């Protein structure tokens, strides 16, 4: 598709779609709880719809009516063997978390996904699940999907140190631990998003968190709840950057989730000198209104414990860095290589084709700014965040056209992205 270029300003106020991580987990917890769960403001992107369909296939009644998702929970032991293989679509979150959920189910399943998911290694979650007594295997020594899994009612608790920072692996092991008899201990390498911990408590579960050490005593029962999903800061990130780098711009983003494990991009914007205001903070919902304005930016260094707090935002942060004076270094981010694409290489190739100066490294990028961007043809390779990054980059292009191939990938997380972009261009 041909993207909008050379815009004069961005103005307006929007509510970004519901948080993808919380949306996935609300369906999972609602299904495993006893009683009814109602979920408001859920993200209806393709990844979350995949999770919803998987739990329907596992025998859970889920109704989507009048903007509210109603889940009739079946309890920890109530899932039923599916008639067919479970389709996870493009969703790494779905296949990893649901592997943990099915660890205690005494039936065999096959889980598969699209071409992109089939290239993503699952050994980081299959290895610890095997230690708990689960029979699970995939293709090659990295356990690429499709996966075959047979759970067990005699799930063993686990004491496990995560070799990488991964909220998905941590969450999969927590779901498994809820079904094991005894105490499981999970130790994180770095702090990662803690939505699973928060929602476990919300649904009446128990755990203790001591620094990076999480202890779960199993088995447990959960109780259905009302869940209100805040806006996704990973989706808001595209507008935060757009408002900072587009000329004569001011954007107001309402009801954005600001869980402290997800706000690394706010730290980066401030380090780069961006104009960012946080107002209307709701400490219970962990949400706020974010306001950004066009800014003069400077390069910075991004690495270490900051990386898990902004791993999904690094593509759009790379674009931000191309519009900052000086050098920005992104390091300790080798995890980018096993996302929907190798995001280190694909981001560098896409932005360099538009005139940026980015050098890929083994664990990140070196970005020299400030760059004038020009027209190009960019392929998302099925990666939603590459698509949205390119659409924001195109706004700055004064010379030439920007063509985006496989733009439909954006529907994975933000189906209304181009509608919101139009409203801000004309605001």
From Swiss-Prot:
Pfam families linked: EPSP_synthase
Record EC number: 2.5.1.19
Pathway: Metabolic intermediate biosynthesis; chorismate biosynthesis; chorismate from D-erythrose 4-phosphate and phosphoenolpyruvate: step 6/7
Alphabetic keyword roster: Amino-acid biosynthesis, Aromatic amino acid biosynthesis, Cytoplasm, Transferase
Catalytic center residues: 312 (proton acceptor)
InterPro entries named in the record: Enolpyruvate_Tfrase_dom, Enolpyruvate_Tfrase_sf, EPSP_synthase, EPSP_synthase_CS, RNA3'P_cycl/enolpyr_Trfase_a/b
Biological role stated in the UniProt entry: Catalyzes the transfer of the enolpyruvyl moiety of phosphoenolpyruvate (PEP) to the 5-hydroxyl of shikimate-3-phosphate (S3P) to produce enolpyruvyl shikimate-3-phosphate and inorganic phosphate.
Protein name (record): 3-phosphoshikimate 1-carboxyvinyltransferase
Gene label: aroA
